[in-house]
Each structure stands twice: as structure tokens, then as C-alpha cells.
Amino acid sequence: MNEFFRWILKHSTPWDIQPPLSDAELDELFGLMSDNEQLSKGAMGMEMADGYMTASLVGPDPLPIPWLLEAIFDQPTLPLPHDSERQQRLLQLLLRRHTDIQASTALSSDEVTPDNVFMPLMAQVPAEECITPYRLDEKHERIGRWELQDWGEGFRRAIAEDDAWEPLLSDPEVGGLVSPVVLYSMGHNPDCPDLQIDEDHELLPLLSVSVCAMRSWWRDYHRSLSAAAIPFERGAPKVGRNDPCPCDSGKKYKK
């Protein structure tokens, strides 16, 4: 059984009225999510979890939080089972970040300010591991690491696990919205080697805009489906069994 269901019912906190995470709280969350000795081997790091949560929130159908947490921690049981205090703190901070993403990606262009614009979480990459001038290894993968690599991979993984993304991906007018995600995940575009991640972060604003545009596209898509599903309304009242026949014969419609 997914233990996150029970935890959420027991700790039902109105996350949406909590203030956005502070820098200190984000640092604390990164630290808790980096506890490789206590967390499952397959658990996501904070950067990847942030990308995964973002894809869930701006995609076709947000994943229920218990299932989302199960995917992030790679287990249906609660993390840090032997330290209830740290467990509580970890889940609280993670769900507040989930709420922060939900709020910032839902803003219209008129509502966005420098203080509330959506920005992905990124972990610092050690200088010795940073990307080099564009080179691929024998597997045609980018050599080195770059900021938001894991974030892009988390977002990409969420898309790959959900076939419901197909309408957006197959739309030639908007399918390119995922291009920044692919670039951050792979470090380069396999179809265009000159398009690559570098150290000037020029793609970061584009990534932010694309993420919010995806949520807007799915909102409009669902509205169009709802409009198409509106049942037919009869233009005139239905003729009753004993009503006069519409042909003006004066006879009853049906005996």
C-alpha cells in the first residue's frame, strides 16, 4: 500500500497558504534529498524531482501527490523511516515546493513579476565536472555535466511515462515547447549539433517561458474538449404522447 496516502490524510496542511520556500529552506531541502545513505538507491535528487514535479503540474493530468511521491522516492513507503522528525520536514518542504511550482506556472503573462516568475531549481556543478567545449563520447552523449541536466531529465522522464502528452508532442505548432527540456536533458540536440547547452545560460529564460506555455496549452486543450462534449440541446420542446400532431391535423401525436 502507498503509505503517502495515509501520511497526507494525517498531515493535511493547507500548503497553498504557506509562503514560498526561502533560500535557507531550499538549501535544507536539497540537503535532505541528498541523503544517499538513508534514501532509496533509486530516489531522485532534488533537481530531478523538481523537473518531474513541474512536468506533472504543467502536463495533461497532474499526478496525484501520493503517486508523485512514490515515483520521486522510488518506493511506496515513507522515506527516512527511522527519523520521523527529518521525514516530516522533508515531506513538508517538498510539498511546499510543489505548491510553489503550481502557483508560479499558473500565472498569466500580465501577472508575472521578477519575484514570482517560475524558475527551476538547480544544483551547482563542481568546476571539475563542468561541460567542456562541445564533444560527444562513443555513445554520442555529451561529455561533462551542466546545470539543470538532472532537472531536464526529470521533466523528460515524466513525459516518457505518460502517453497523454502525445497531443502536444504531435502538434507541429507547439511541439517545440519541449525543445529546451530536451536540450537541458541531453546537453545538445541530436538533429542539430550546433544547438547545445553552454555556460551563458541563454536558454534559461526560454525554458521558463516554455514551461508556462505548456500549462496554458493544456488548459486550452481541455477546454476545447469540454466544449466539444457539450450535449445537443433540442431547439423545440419534445412533442408529448397526447399533444396535437405538429402537422396541424388536429389529431393526437401518438395513440
Language model regions located:
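Acidic/negatively charged segments and metal-coordination signatures
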Residues: M1-K255
